[in-house]
Amino acid sequence: MEFEFIKNTLLGEYAVRCNMEHQIVGRWLQEEIGQDLAKLKHVLTLIDKAEQSPAQEFLWTGREISLLVQGDEITVQENALAYESEHELETDFALYDSESIAACGREDFVALLTQWQSFIQNQGRF
């Protein structure tokens, strides 16, 4: 997974850009976690638990985007996708799935999170 961290020095805001297949991961990190290091620590703990119990699924539910951890696989998806599959919306109103869901390996995801944590703690400097 390719990503780049950015800090807007005028506004003090942090952002992440991910490759096209993982845009939802970047949105999740910015919108659901942001600069909240306690949330970030909670997610990292959840990933550790999933590694210890690979047959079990662990879910972190955000306001708009959620995270599913199962063993070495991480799935990030918009909550609207779960609603959509339950309620079979018309095709014209269906979300473009490739921008609304992404999967990646545990190692790549943990690397993203730990580098984001360092970026935030060092105020946008590595």
Swiss-Prot record:
Domain of life per record: Bacteria
Residues annotated as transmembrane: none
UniProt xrefs under InterPro entries: UPF0231 (IPR008249)
Pfam families the record matches: UPF0231
Annotated family: Belongs to the UPF0231 family.
HAMAP family: UPF0231
Protein name (database record): UPF0231 protein VC_0605
Species annotation: Vibrio cholerae serotype O1 (strain ATCC 39315 / El Tor Inaba N16961)
